[in-house]
């Protein structure tokens, strides 16, 4: 059953929805607590890093269906922890200031880079580590999964910076509240059609490999990547189409505490 492409598609969809939701939930809970709670979240999540590294290493020589799933989950675990560290404000960048209005485009770009520089450096380092580990490995899907997530995320960030009609900031945590000033709500730029076209073509290429490859494990691996690429494409369209994507996770979120609530908690009232 785990060798079924449908099972791979369902797993990818569920993992995308659940992992996004649990990270957003944990960040909101920490937002409602103290500043230390965000750091605690990242520390509590450290086993994900250990599990991800161990799983990625164990999957390198295993091209079975189980090995493919292990590689995929390893990459998702590493990615999930890095995203948690970013959204918690622990690993971000040297610039934590809002972007002033009417800043020149080049200045605005480097300010935006400064808000995420350390986070991007960690992503690149992890990607390079997985790449080196899988150069001669039978199972490259841990690297493939992480690389796909990385490229899709870079594309999304660039589109948010250059301009898209819809930007959902209601889940933006307090440590990253300054990021909203670096986004641009407006008409799409030339990058958006390039991004969605590239993701569409790559999804089709991955689907072709999933259908035509004879090895059952490889077929599952390409199916997982196809679904992940289609979800990345969907996330890009969420930036343009008037779809209530926030409803997928909003019901999971505890109510955000007001500043008054925080002051009362601090005074024990």
Which functions belong to the PLM regions below?
Residues 91-108, 159-183, 246-257:
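Cytosolic, membrane-interface loops and tails of multi-pass inner-membrane proteins
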Residues 65-119:
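Intramembrane catalytic core of multi-pass membrane enzymes that act on lipidic substrates
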Residues 41-61, 78-82:
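A generic, lipid-embedded transmembrane alpha helix
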Residues 112-167:
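Hydrophobic, aromatic-enriched interface-forming segments
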Residues 18-21, 77-92, 147-165, 227-242:
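Transmembrane alpha-helical segments that form the membrane-embedded catalytic/substrate-channel core
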Residues 11-28:
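N-terminal signal-anchor/start-transfer transmembrane helix
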């Amino acid at each position: 059953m785990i060798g079924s492409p449908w099972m791979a598609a369902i797993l990818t969809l569920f993992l995308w929805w659940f992992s996004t939701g649990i990270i957003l939930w944990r960040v909101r809970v920490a937002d409602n607590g103290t500043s230390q709670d965000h750091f605690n979240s990242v520390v509590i999540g450290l086993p994900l890093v250990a599990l991800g590294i161990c799983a990625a290493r164990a999957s390198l020589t295993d091209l079975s269906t189980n090995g493919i799933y292990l590689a995929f989950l390893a990459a998702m675990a590493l990615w999930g922890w890095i995203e948690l560290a970013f959204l918690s404000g622990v690993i971000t960048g040297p610039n934590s200031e809002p972007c002033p209005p009417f800043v020149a485009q080049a200045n605005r770009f480097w300010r935006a880079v400064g808000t995420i520089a350390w986070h991007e450096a960690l992503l690149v380092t992890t990607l390079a580590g997985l790449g080196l580990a899988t150069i001669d490995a039978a199972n490259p899907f841990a690297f493939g999964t992480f690389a796909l997530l990385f490229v899709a995320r870079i594309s999304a960030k660039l589109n948010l910076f250059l301009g898209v009609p819809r930007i959902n900031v209601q889940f933006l945590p307090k440590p990253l509240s300054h990021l909203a000033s670096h986004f641009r709500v407006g008409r799409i730029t030339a990058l958006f059609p390039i991004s969605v076209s590239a993701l569409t073509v790559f999804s089709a290429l991955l689907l072709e490999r999933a259908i035509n490859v004879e090895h059952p494990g490889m077929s599952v691996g390409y199916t997982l990547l196809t679904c992940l690429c289609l979800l990345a494409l969907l996330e890009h369209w969420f930036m343009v189409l008037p779809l209530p994507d926030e409803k997928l996770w909003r019901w999971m979120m505890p109510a955000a505490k007001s500043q008054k609530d925080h002051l009362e908690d601090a005074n024990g009232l």
